Amino acid sequence: MEAIAKHRFASISPQKARLVADQIRGKSVDQALEILTFSNKKAAVIIKKVVESAIANAEHNEGADIDDLNVAKIFVDEGPIMKRIMPRAKGRADRILKRSSHITIVVADR
């Protein structure tokens, strides 16, 4: 059985979130939470909440045992990009891209 949790429009770039996602792919949920707890990346805090949500979904909706769960799939897709302007010298302007992510986690039995 599988349980899914998503965090859409997370305010972190997909490139940075994928660094953390690659570390927990295929691990047991206990091991994944441990890795995320001791990581000092912003993405780790966001992804940890999604993993905890997926665990709660598996327990509540599917009646799964937490000890048997592992991170079957985790992927980070690109969300919408907000474009902002940063004023520069001599009347010029640069574009700043505020990137967002859609984080999806699937937990399943081993």
UniProtKB/Swiss-Prot annotation:
Entry keywords, A to Z: Ribonucleoprotein, Ribosomal protein, RNA-binding, rRNA-binding
Family according to the record: Belongs to the universal ribosomal protein uL22 family.
Name of the gene this protein is made from: rplV
GO molecular function, one term: structural constituent of ribosome
CC annotations in GO: cytosolic large ribosomal subunit
Biological-process GO terms, alphabetical: translation
Listed name of the protein: Large ribosomal subunit protein uL22
Cited Pfam families: Ribosomal_L22
Ribonucleoprotein in keyword set: yes
Entry function: This protein binds specifically to 23S rRNA; its binding is stimulated by other ribosomal proteins, e.g. L4, L17, and L20. It is important during the early stages of 50S assembly. It makes multiple contacts with different domains of the 23S rRNA in the assembled 50S subunit and ribosome. The globular domain of the protein is located near the polypeptide exit tunnel on the outside of the subunit, while an extended beta-hairpin is found that lines the wall of the exit tunnel in the center of the 70S ribosome.
SUPFAM superfamilies listed in its UniProt record: Ribosomal protein L22
TM annotation in the entry: none
